[in-house]
Amino acid sequence: MKQDRFLVGILVGIAVLVVVALAVFFTRRGTQAYIADDVPEGVVHNYVLAILNKNYEKAYGYLADLENKPTYEQFRDAFIKGVVNPNNSAIDVGKSEINGDTASVEVGMIYNPSDPFSTGYRDVQHASLIKQESSWKLSSMPSYYFWDYSWYQEPPK
């Protein structure tokens, strides 16, 4: 009889832990929010979040108006067709360094492991921004998960 109560207690404890874990999982999902984009790191954060939310129009608004800028259709199609695929990585936006009308933002790329026995890895690079009409705009991002390297490149002749 004591063993039955003990077993029931263990099972109830496990059930409570499972319910708590599920509650935490579902309440934490989607808690990312847009932040002020008056600083370079805010622009990078909001660009990445817009891409992850598939809000390509908002993300496109963060691109600098430079020569050979992709059209909105080219930009959107790169994500829709999978040329640029952000699903296998995450970004940690770090500090920015501003020098006049240019800025560099530390971007930590966090890559998922390719199999269950590997660990992911982190690679720190920098996004480049320029100030246009008093707003910070992206001129390059270090990752092909969020940026197509053909953007802003002169087309081949």
Features from the language model and the residues they span:
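The identity of the second residue at the extreme N-terminus of proteins
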Residues: 1-2, 136
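Short, low-complexity N-terminal intrinsically disordered segments enriched in polar/charged residues
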Residues: 2-53
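Intrinsically disordered, low-complexity segments enriched in polar/charged residues with Gly/Pro
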Residues: 13, 36, 81-84, 113-117
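Soluble non-cytosolic domains of exported or imported proteins
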Residues: 34, 38-42, 50-54, 66-73, ...
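Short solvent-exposed beta->alpha transition segments
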Residues: 42, 46, 56-106, 110, ...
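Exposed beta-sheet edge and beta->alpha loop/turn motif
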Residues: 98-157
